[in-house]
Amino acid sequence: CNFNLSKRIKPRKQKAKLGEYSTFLEKEIFEQADCIRDSTRGRFSKDYSSVVFGGIDTNKEIKRVVFLGCGTAYHAGLLGKYYMENIAGIPASVEISSEYRYKNNPTEDGTLVVAISQSGETIDTLFAVREAQDKGVDTIAITNTVMSSIARQVEEGIYQRVGQEVSVASTKAFTSQVTLILMLAVLLGRKNKLSAIESKEYIKQIRYLPKLVGDTLELCKESIKKTAVASSLTPSCTFLGRQYMYPIAIEGALKLKELCYISTHGYPTGELKHGPIAHMCPMYF
């Protein structure tokens, strides 16, 4: 959708309800399947062969993509880098918003900056967007708040549609961001190396995601409880992942750090032997 609306609107205050859940975090975790469904609804062509984002100009030639984000949004951007390079065949990088402002960022024709922010009010990301625009770079945003500061700052945007997220530890917003970035990679890939058949297969898998996520959450309920008990006494925890799972590993480390206030780390699997293994101990998880 195009965020640059000419009229002012008064935001509606919504009071979130717990329903059957004991915490908002639990509620939002189990809303992920529906949120992915809402984020993707109406954004495919009638024959499901291509992605359609109404507010994105698909006529521009994109030669490079730069993702901007902080915290969880930065981790979504890390996944976006893999998607853009492996699916769309477009060189990509990801920058921590607070660092981007103070770097000498080379620009070239065909560069697209994608700002990721659930609230649309992340000040470091807003300033990073302005920095990119000052250099003449095209900018879009992936945000959950249409009339937010970032949404109004960028030229174009993609609205997440996940509803209010109350918990400090982002869950459903993250899965929505990752899904929309994957769809963006498929969209840009069709202008590059991705065939119609390949695009259709990716879209088929994306449409299956809500069921897959819902089924996985139901299946893992008991095993998650057992894992939580087993790890509750550990003083520290390390998450490992390779390729697409590396951003998930550091996102998992951030989640445990935010929620349990223990020391956590995330590394590429192959890096374990290059230093991190030194602080492993029997109480380590």
Give the location of each predicted region.
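A short linear-motif detector with a strong N-terminal bias
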Residues: N4-K7, K15, I29, F44-K46, ...
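Active-site phosphate/pyrophosphate-binding segments
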Residues: E31-I36, T40-V66, E156-F285
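Composition- and surface-driven signal marking solvent-exposed, interaction-prone regions
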Residues: L5-K7, L79-G80, F127-A128, E251-G252, ...
